[in-house]
Amino acid sequence: RALPIATGKDWDGHKVKQGAVLYVAGEGGFGVTQRVRAWELQHKVNNLDNLARLPVPIFPADNDQVKATIEYCYEIESKTGHAVKLIIFDTLARCYGGNDENSSKDMGAFIKGCDTIKQLTGATVLVVHHSGKNVDNGGRGSSSLPAALDVEYRVSREGENLQALILTCSKMKD
């Protein structure tokens, strides 16, 4: 959903409010570049000025990095004329700074950093996270993460050769 927000193009038949997007590619940066290029070709778009990509992780559990992220969001707004509406941390494991993902204390610091970024920028913060070995048990690590989430979606594959992506809402607060 990052690219429709950055361009203001409809997503799956729904109107989208345009804004800037910050994509933190903590892993798979080359793959992200390929997917962005494929989307540009498919949608005949060649102006993604509202998409800022960082090829290195940001650690929301680190107060200095939280401040730097907020300042960077304001720089993006100044440059593009659009407030940052979406910040994507891809993935939690890479943006966790070596902390223990099973520790509620460490996860609490990560959540607090994300909340501070969200509150001070007004952006939605999306964290890409991997499930554990048992997919039915949800994401890896401390249970304080799912407890703090407003919304959680699970992405799975289905069908012949696992071609179809299925997006399932597994939690919706309020």
What residue spans do the PLM features occupy?
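Short, glycine-/polar-rich solvent-exposed loops and beta-turns at beta-strand/coil boundaries
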Residues: 14-17, 159-161
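Phosphate-binding/switch region of NTP-binding enzymes
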Residues: 86, 94, 105-174
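Walker A/P-loop NTP-binding motif
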Residues: 1-13
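Conserved inter-motif catalytic segment of the P-loop NTP-binding fold
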Residues: 10, 16-100, 105, 109, ...
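Conserved RecA-like P-loop NTPase ATPase core
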Residues: 2, 23, 90, 149, ...
